[in-house]
Regions:
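Conserved beta-strand->loop/alpha-helix structural units within folded catalytic cores of enzymes
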Residues: 2, 20-23, 256, 264
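Short, strongly hydrophobic transmembrane alpha-helices
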Residues: 8-29
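Transmembrane alpha-helix signature in integral membrane proteins
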Residues: 11, 254-286
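Short alpha-helical basic/polar micro-motif
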Residues: 19, 249, 260
Length: 290
């Protein structure tokens, strides 16, 4: 009864109970193929993702944030959407305006950018078995994962040649160079071997696009490919990339990491308490005996 009348004790008990529930339940319900792959280097591709929840997306918990970007970056994101059908820009607050405080000749956009979609494409090197497995998954699920390889030699800016989202003739800042009709000009590879690609092809492909560049000997071939980061995540881990508290710089799920840390702290506290109790009991017994 005295415990129940003490508000501080009740509050502390509730907090401890919530911490226990968080530490015990969250690692169980959030345990999946992604969180249990602790040594997976693919994690690094999904670093610093923002908190996202389908249930609370209406409240701004949608994995996106407001940014001010240049017109070149805006065109870059638009080109990503043209290829993938996924727009990294979820909302435009202010479009194509000049900033008197900027030294750049560019105009700017105030937009909301999805941290998940903005990753775009990834450059991967696959084994023959991995290459075939993705193609089989594409056929089974009718979802495009592998996209055509590009002729990086036709990109003038050396720093952009390794950018997997550049699939078109571009300026030195990554913005598309449009043809006379205002269309983007693809630079997809049409020559060379791609390991007999036999799966889904993107719209507009007449069968000439190459979906990989093959390196190595016939005994140990490697396949360099461009994959869509969202659909590749689904293929590899079996679910959409959605993280309630986002991810850290290493791509680790923050919610799961927090719960595992809380569980370790509670376990450590129990061990220390048990040690203190044992030492106290022995010391007290010795003092009482003598």
């Amino acid at each position: 009864m005295r415990f129940c009348r003490n508000k501080s004790s009740l509050t502390a008990a509730v907090i401890i109970a919530l911490l226990l529930a968080f530490a015990l339940i969250v690692p169980l319900v959030s345990h999946n193929n992604y969180t249990k792959s602790k040594t997976d280097t693919t994690y690094l591709q999904y670093g610093k993702l923002l908190p996202k929840s389908k249930l609370f997306s209406w409240a701004g918990w949608d994995g996106a944030k407001r940014e001010t970007i240049s017109s070149d970056m805006y065109a870059y994101y638009e080109a990503m959407e043209t290829e993938r059908g996924v727009n990294a820009i979820t909302k435009v607050y202010k479009a194509d305006y000049e900033d008197s405080s900027s030294t750049s000749n560019s105009t700017f956009y105030d937009v909301r950018v999805d941290s998940y979609s903005k990753i775009g494409m990834l450059n991967l090197t696959l084994t023959k078995a991995e290459y075939e497995a993705i193609q089989d998954w594409q056929d089974e699920n009718q979802i495009q994962v592998i996209y055509p390889s590009v002729d990086s030699k036709s990109i003038q800016a050396p720093n952009l040649r390794s950018d997997p989202n550049i699939w078109y003739k571009c300026t030195n800042k990554g913005a598309p160079k449009l043809d006379k009709d205002g269309n983007i000009t693809p630079i997809y590879l049409t020559k060379g071997k791609d390991g007999d690609y036999h799966s889904l092809r993107i719209a507009g492909d007449d069968g000439s696009y190459r979906y990989a560049t093959v390196t190595g000997s016939s005994a140990s071939m490697s396949f360099k490919v461009r994959v869509d980061s969202l659909s590749y995540f689904q293929y590899r881990y079996g679910h959409e990339p959605i993280f309630l508290f986002g991810t850290n710089a290493y791509g680790q799920d923050i919610l799961t990491r927090m719960a595992e840390g809380a569980r370790f702290s509670l376990l450590f506290a129990l061990i220390i308490s048990a040690i203190n109790l044992a030492i106290g009991a022995v010391y007290g017994a010795i003092e009482g005996f003598y």
